[in-house]
Amino acid sequence: MKIACIGGGPGGLYFAISIKLQKPSTDVIVIERNKPADTFGWGVVLSDETLDNLEKNDSISAESIRSNFAYWDDIALHHKGKKLKSTGHGFCGIGRKTLLVILQERARELGVQLKFESEVGSASDYMNDYDIVVAADGLNSKTRSEYAEIFKPDTDLRKCQFVWLGTKQKFDDAFTFIFEKTKHGWVWAHAYQFDSDTATFIVECSQDTFDAFGFNNLTQTESINVCQDIFKNYLDDNKLMTNANHIRGSAWIKFPRVICEKWSHKNI
C-alpha cells in the first residue's frame, strides 16, 4: 500500500508513525512545504491522558516527548490582585519545534519518507499514484476548501481575538491565567512553560477591547509593546516575543471551530 500524507505538522507526522507501526510494509511519504525546523508557534500542551495514549501507541516517541517537556500539576489564576491556585491537573508543555524534531526522527527510523520545501498543490494530484491521500494540511486546509461541497465544513469563528507570543519569564510552577482590567476592557493571558528557558504567553481579549486598543492597525512590535505594558507586573522586565514575522500586520487571530459533515472523498 502507498500513502501520501499532505502536511508535515505533528498530526501528519504522528499519523505516518502510527501507520508504519501497524503496517510496516506500507510505503508512506509526508510532504511539507516548509523547512524541517520551521514553526510559527511556541509551546503546545498535552494532558496526562494524552501522554498515556501516546505511550500506548508508541512508547519510543512518547519517551522522547516526556524527556523534553515541562510538567506541572497546578493551575494558577490571577484576578484583581488575588492569586487562586487549583491542584491535581496534570499537563505538560513542549516546544512545537522540539516536538516536530522528535516526530521527524521517529518517522525516519520507521522508514517514512519526508519531503520538505515542496509545494503540495492539489490533493487530487496524488489520487492516482497513491492508495490513500491523507490531508493533514492544517486548520486552513486547502484540501477541505477544494472539496468544500463534499466535506461540507461548518466553521464557527469565535468572538475573541488572540495573539500567540513567547517570553523568557518563568511560568514553571503552574499553568497560569492572568486577567487585567484596562481602560479599554479586560485583557487576559494564558502562560505556561514549555522548556527550561521559554514560556508560551497567549494574550486574548474581546473584539470590542481589540478595536478600542486599535490592535488591527498596529505593527507586531507596537502590539507587543502594548501587551508588555498591560502585563508588566508579571514579566519581571522580560520581553514578549513573536516568531510570526512572516505575517503582515499585528498577527492577532480568532479561534475557529471546524466540523465537517463528511471526512473522506474517494481515497482522500
Predicted features along the sequence, with ranges:
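Conserved N-terminal helical subregion
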Residues: 48-164
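Beta1/beta-strand and adjacent pyrophosphate-binding region of the FAD-binding site
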Residues: 1-11
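Conserved FAD-binding catalytic core of PHBH/FMO-like flavoproteins
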Residues: 105, 129-255, 259, 264
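Glycine-rich FAD pyrophosphate-binding loop
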Residues: 18-41
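Conserved N-terminal glycine-rich FAD pyrophosphate-binding loop of Rossmann-like flavoproteins
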Residues: 35-53
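Conserved Rossmann-like nucleotide-cofactor binding loop
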Residues: 11, 15, 36, 140
